[in-house]
Structure formats: structure tokens, C-alpha cells
Amino acid sequence: MAKLSLKNIAKRYPGAERRVLEEISAEIADGEFVVIVGPSGCGKSTLLRMVAGLESTEDGEIRIGERLVNQLEPKDRDIAMVFQNYALYPHMTVAENMGYALKLKGLKKVEIMERVLKVAAVLELEQLLQRKPRELSGGQRQRVAMGRAIVREPAVFLFDEPLSNLDAKLRGQMRLEIQRLHRRLATTSLYVTHDQVEAMTLADRVIVLNKGHIEQIGAPDEIYDRPATAFVAAFMGSPGMNLFDAQADESGERLLLGDGVSLALPAANPALAGRRLKAGIRPEHLRAAGEGGETLSLRVDSLEMLGADNYVYGLLAGQNVVARLAHGHRPEPGSRLEVAVRAESLHLFDAETQRRIEHAAASQASLAVS
């Protein structure tokens, strides 16, 4: 095992106007599980492929342990990769697929089989070792792909959207499987996904990527509770945070949301007076009236009933919002719903920079740079 260091990584494809990746720096500790998450086209898979040696690096340094690996071939980097499409050899059995990389390294058959059997037991693949990939389900194929990576005993695991081809139930099962494996193996892991649920449930830390730039690095609860930018606030969460174009009033005590709607700021702050802001409210913080906080009126457009929770979609202060309510609340489309908002649940972002404004530093209107 080893730490993974990325320093000022940059990438531009020939003929492209802008870089795909710009000044990416991150330190991944020995044994840490880090998830890179972002929308399609943000550069996350390109970054993973650069770590693997499948893409060249324009600028910057990639180190695995203390070794600079920029110029090393993939086979010499001591990494193992799990792909979205499994990448299994169709003519080989499960056992042969899992042991093939060890065979190429020249290991003896006895040692290869020992490793394969050991990993097969961990992944509950013992009964499938003589089957071909076509005889396996999607979840079984992905477990074989993971097993093939594990038998190599690499310094770093790389996962490229490994659950994307699975249905929702299997994705949930495989998330638990990956969690369990990481607790057991404690191998340094870099995992790429567009799915924020995977990021929040699997990661020790999350790297949120957008348009080739890092928006925020932090633990899942930090990313969710204190998003560094309006982009992170909207992207992380299901549904994402409601964002309003807003402005502080001239006293710095209230937030003007539009259509005559206003809310008290968490703390009076004259330095914010008249300032244009983005205001954020998580769907679960639009509570049913009577649960504390200022009461606002939401016009209901539609309702999604999801069992324990109901999602109410509608208009508030002239802007589209979603509120997450308990199962018993079922407002009719076209009706008015009274919701309550506590001041401390507000998130504030600068309208121009989109950076977070911390409540604790609001007296100086400081921008968070974490």
C-alpha cells in the first residue's frame, strides 16, 4: 500500500481551446478511500486514466508512494483498475480471468491458484470459478472484475464508474460489498463516479470536480453540511439544494428572495447590507409549518411519493423549489403549502464568486476558501 500524490496536474487535448484538467492537486493517504465525483465532462475519468498511465500528463506530478510515475507504463505503476464494462475475457473462466495478470507476471500456477481461491472466498465466487463471463449476472461479473484487481495486491486500486451498468438494487448491494472489502483490505483507493450517492456512502473524502477544476475536497458530511460553492450545494444531495437569487436588505438583517418574500439572516451583519447573494436551503429544511422557523407559502406543482418521504415540487419566491416532507404530508397540486425555514439552515454564497459565506464569519462577510 502507498499514498497517492497529485500535484498541479493539467491536461489539454490537441486542438482543444481549454484544458480538460487545470491545476489538480490532492494528497490521498495510505489506506484512504477517495471518491472523485462530478457531472459528465468534468474530467474525472481523464484524471483517473492519467493516474493509471492510460493518458499522458501535460503538466504536474503523479506519485505513488515516493515514486514519480508520470513516465512509467501502467504495468509498472503497481496499480489495479476496475472498469465500468468489467473488461473480462469472454473465452476464459472466472478463475482464469482473475489470475491472468499474475500469469503475465510469471508467478507459478500454485501461487496463482492460492491467491485466486483466497480472493474468491472473500467475494463468494468459489462456486463460479469454472464459469465463463456469459454465464454470470452483471453483479457477478463486477465481483469477478474486482477479484481480478484484488489478487494483484496493488499499492493503489482505481475504480472507473464500476457500478454504472448495474440496476438500482445491485448498485446498492455492490456499494455495501465495496465498503466491506475496503474495511478488510485497507488499500489506497481512488474511485470515480457521477453518482453522488456512491460518493457520500463510500468515501473517506470526496473530491468534487467541475469543468476541470476542484470545487471542494472534504469528508462527505462536510461536503453536504458546508458546501464550499453554489455548484457543490446544488450537485451534492438528492435532490440538490434549492438556490435562490437573493439580496441582503439595507440593514443586513434580512434576506430578500423575490416576490416580496424575505427571511431573517442567521445573524445581523451590516457588512452584507445591499449585497447580492445566492441563498441555499436543503429540501429537508423546508419543513411543514409549525415545526419552528419563519413561515413561507409554497405553490404546489407536483408531488412524488417515495414511501417514507414525499417530495413536493413547486414555486417559492418566484423560483422552482423542492421540499422533502414526511410520509403523512400529501398536498394537492395547485394548492398552497405553508413551510417553515429556520435561519440557521440557510446557506449563503457570493453572487459573483459563487463561494460560500460562513455564518460564523458573517460579521466580516468572510468568504470560505475551504
Curated annotation (Swiss-Prot):
Part of the ABC transporter complex UgpBAEC involved in sn-glycerol-3-phosphate (G3P) import. Responsible for energy coupling to the transport system. Residues 4-236 form the ABC transporter domain. It is found in: Cell inner membrane. The keyword Repeat does not apply. Belongs to the ABC transporter superfamily. sn-glycerol-3-phosphate importer (TC 3.A.1.1.3) family. It is an enzyme of class 7 (translocase). CDD domains: ABC_MalK_N (cd03301). This is sn-glycerol-3-phosphate import ATP-binding protein UgpC. Its main location: membrane. It is a peripheral membrane protein. GO terms for biological process: carbohydrate transport; glycerophosphodiester transmembrane transport. Pfam families: ABC_tran, TOBE_2. Its EC number is 7.6.2.10. The complex is composed of two ATP-binding proteins (UgpC), two transmembrane proteins (UgpA and UgpE) and a solute-binding protein (UgpB). PANTHER family: MALTODEXTRIN IMPORT ATP-BINDING PROTEIN MSMX, SN-GLYCEROL-3-PHOSPHATE IMPORT ATP-BINDING PROTEIN UGPC. One of its GO terms (cellular component) is ATP-binding cassette (ABC) transporter complex, substrate-binding subunit-containing. Keywords: ATP-binding, Cell inner membrane, Cell membrane, Membrane, Nucleotide-binding, Sugar transport, Translocase, Transport.
